[in-house]
């Protein structure tokens, strides 16, 4: 039995190797997921959210992850997503503007792809929330 898990996040632009940690908490399509050491192997879809992880010193950390896939295999957690940003890398003005645009598009549903606008709204809200933590 292992005491830790490894976390790595992959996006088209970058790979983020977090390394060994104690726990990962993120959000799948069916709700929150908590991954601890010795978790059963699995694959699931993820929503845009604030993914939380606890490092080996017990510090709580946050990182934005967009929609994607999470894979757990042999105490390794892989998140493959469209985008991932640490709080310090998020442009809050850009996120707020994206939120306003998405909300406006959703108000005018006749002219837009609703699913795409909803995802844009989820992404912008998660980016704003992570800056507020």
Swiss-Prot record:
Its chief place of residence is: membrane
Keyword RNA-binding among record annotations: no
This protein's GO cellular component annotations are: plasma membrane; proton-transporting ATP synthase complex
Q: Name one Pfam family in it.
A: ATP-synt_DE
Keyword flag Glycoprotein: no
Extract one GO molecular function annotation from the record: proton-transporting ATP synthase activity, rotational mechanism
User: What's this chain's function?
Assistant: Produces ATP from ADP in the presence of a proton gradient across the membrane.
Instruction: State how it assembles.
Output: F-type ATPases have 2 components, CF(1) - the catalytic core - and CF(0) - the membrane proton channel. CF(1) has five subunits: alpha(3), beta(3), gamma(1), delta(1), epsilon(1). CF(0) has three main subunits: a, b and c.
Q: What is this protein called?
A: ATP synthase epsilon chain
Gene source species: Clostridium botulinum (strain Langeland / NCTC 10281 / Type F)
């Amino acid at each position: 039995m292992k005491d830790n898990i490894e976390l790595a996040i992959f996006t088209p632009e970058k790979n983020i190797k977090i390394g060994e940690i104690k726990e990962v908490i993120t959000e799948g399509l069916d709700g929150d997921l908590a991954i601890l050491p010795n978790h059963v192997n699995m694959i699931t879809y993820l929503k845009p959210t604030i993914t939380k992880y606890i490092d080996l010193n017990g510090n709580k950390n946050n990182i934005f992850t967009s929609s994607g896939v999470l894979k757990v295999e042999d105490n390794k957690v892989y998140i493959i997503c469209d985008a991932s940003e640490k709080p310090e890398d998020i442009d809050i003005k850009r996120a707020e503007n994206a939120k306003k645009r998405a909300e406006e598009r959703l108000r005018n549903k006749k002219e837009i792809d609703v699913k795409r606008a909803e995802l844009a709204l989820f992404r912008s809200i998660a980016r704003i929330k992570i800056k507020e933590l």
